[in-house]
Amino acid sequence: MTSAIEDLLSTTVEILKAAIHCYTTVKDDNSLRGAFHGAGERLRCVAQALEAATSHIARHGLDGDLEEPRNLLQICSTKVKQSRDIFQMVARAPQTSRLPFYKAAVKQLGNGQVVEDLVKGMMIDVCVFAENNAIKGMMRKEVAVLRNAIETLSNMEPSLSTERAGDSYNNWSTGDMLNAPRGKVTKNNFSGATFSGTVSF
């Protein structure tokens, strides 16, 4: 199971690198809002955290039942793929039409989720994954970077003001639930519980 997790980590990092490459194409496009660029710029933080986790797991393994961390990584990987697909669609769009292409990509490829929400979601997934006792102490620096990035993205104006889906909140373990799509980070502990839902304001 550990090798399967390492393989999933490696695959997810490669997809992140592809997303980073796509974002680089549009990083200077001022027609796209700050949160779009904030999300693209912070993909590298996620990749670095996953690379660090891969290195620590190779040396120390993981504690406890491995089904939960594997499932969590699969959920994270789905968000990474959605982000890559959205950035790719925007990067391939004509320079004068990137914003409408982004709107279409969010609807078609992101299930209504804008890139900053997808990136915040994957960051939360990685923070929860890093709670595993075998790597928790060694991942403190990366987790701190991710939590700061989550808060920064949460305080940015949304990359799209319309055609948005509701906000999704998820907590898969005993760690903090960080839920702040368009506001400051709040933390709620649910011991061993799973909370997943859609909330509209």
Enumerate the predicted regions with their spans.
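Sequence-level detector for tyrosine residue identity
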Residues: 23, 101-102, 169
